[in-house]
Design a protein with these regions (language model features):
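Short terminal alpha-helical segments
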Residues: 2-23
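Acidic, low-complexity, intrinsically disordered interaction modules
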Residues: 25-82
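N-terminal non-cleavable signal-anchor helices
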Residues: 8-9, 50, 91
Length: 92
């Protein structure tokens, strides 16, 4: 479960960073794109996060929903349909 908590914390930091940056640039929306692979590196190209993850894929879905719900509770509009593609579309 520690790995899951680390994933959620990392995803949450990434979301916060991109959203704050988009707001500063007066963007109307931002796409959080998460890619899970066998690396433990951050790939900044195309704002895609790649982190090591080799356990139950269901935990990824749980983490995505947690992040989306967290953003929605902050008053942001979230596209839940994109979660299946490991993306979260957020309207600012």
């Amino acid at each position: 479960m520690k790995n899951y908590e680390n994933i959620v914390a990392f995803m949450n930091e990434y979301a916060t960073m991109l959203i704050e940056s988009a707001k500063k640039n007066n963007e109307s929306s931002v796409l959080l794109s998460y890619e899970f692979g066998m690396k433990d590196a951050l790939n900044n190209a195309f704002d895609t996060v790649t982190i090591q993850y080799s356990e139950d894929a269901g935990l990824i879905d749980d983490a995505m929903l947690y992040i989306a719900n967290n953003l929605e509770q902050k008053g942001l509009s979230v596209d839940f349909d994109s979660i299946e593609d490991l993306n979260i579309a957020v309207r600012l």
